[in-house]
């Protein structure tokens, strides 16, 4: 990725890959490091559904300006971790949720090995906040802090949506693009956007 100008400083940007826990997909990850400043810590971003790490570049540059190294991966089925457009939104044929969590933990392990002397934080948004919450609960002490935004909690409609989702996947396959599911999960959000893609 090279260098970025931002926040009045140079920022070194690197992109690399590692093998997903699903054993098939290459996961793209990114590191933005401020150049020539005292480092205060590492912040790993776990993005939301229908997103990718590069959507957070401006925010990452801001954090670099404060002395933080920022990293994140494109989750399975997102960004450069979706090799073909057909793969967008698809995690894996089996245990995709666990692969998603393991992939975020893999980046944590990579970064902590490089920067073990720095405080380490995870920031998760939406789906990424659920991943962050699971990692914090499964691995106490792994992170020095956790920030969640746009997270969710138990809701009576979740059970209905899960049954409908499972029924569609069972009858049409795990890569089915369902307008009904899109409307159920994103309808209220998409109504707020004129001409959503």
Regions found by a protein language model. Give the residues of each.
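N-terminal cap/lid segment of alpha/beta-hydrolase-fold proteins
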Residues: 2-35
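Active-site glycine-rich loops that stabilize anionic/oxyanionic intermediates
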Residues: 43-51, 126
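Alpha/beta-hydrolase
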Residues: 46, 73-75, 149
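Conserved alpha/beta-hydrolase
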Residues: 53, 58-86
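Alpha/beta-hydrolase active-site loop
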Residues: 92-112
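Alpha/beta-hydrolase fold nucleophile elbow
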Residues: 115-126
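Glycine-rich nucleophile elbow surrounding the catalytic serine of serine-hydrolase chemistry
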Residues: 124-134
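Alpha/beta-hydrolase-fold enzymes
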Residues: 132-197
């Amino acid at each position: 990725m090279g260098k970025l100008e931002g926040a009045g400083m140079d920022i070194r940007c690197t992109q690399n890959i590692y093998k997903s826990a699903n054993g098939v997909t290459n996961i793209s990850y990114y590191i933005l490091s401020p150049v020539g400043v005292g480092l205060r810590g590492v912040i790993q971003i776990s993005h939301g559904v229908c997103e990718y790490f590069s959507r957070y570049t401006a925010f990452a540059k801001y954090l670099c300006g404060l002395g933080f190294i920022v990293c994140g991966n494109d989750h399975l089925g997102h960004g450069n971790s979706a090799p073909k457009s057909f793969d967008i939104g698809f995690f894996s044929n089996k245990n995709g949720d666990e692969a998603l969590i393991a992939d975020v933990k893999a980046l944590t392990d990579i970064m902590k090995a490089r920067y073990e002397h720095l405080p380490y934080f995870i920031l998760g948004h939406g789906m990424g906040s659920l991943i962050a919450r699971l990692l914090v609960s499964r691995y106490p002490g792994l992170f020095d802090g956790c920030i969640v935004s746009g997270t969710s909690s138990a809701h009576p409609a979740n059970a209905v949506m899960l049954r409908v989702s499972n029924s569609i996947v069972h009858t049409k396959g795990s890569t089915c693009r369902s307008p009904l599911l899109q409307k159920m999960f994103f309808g209220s959000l998409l109504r707020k956007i004129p001409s959503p893609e």
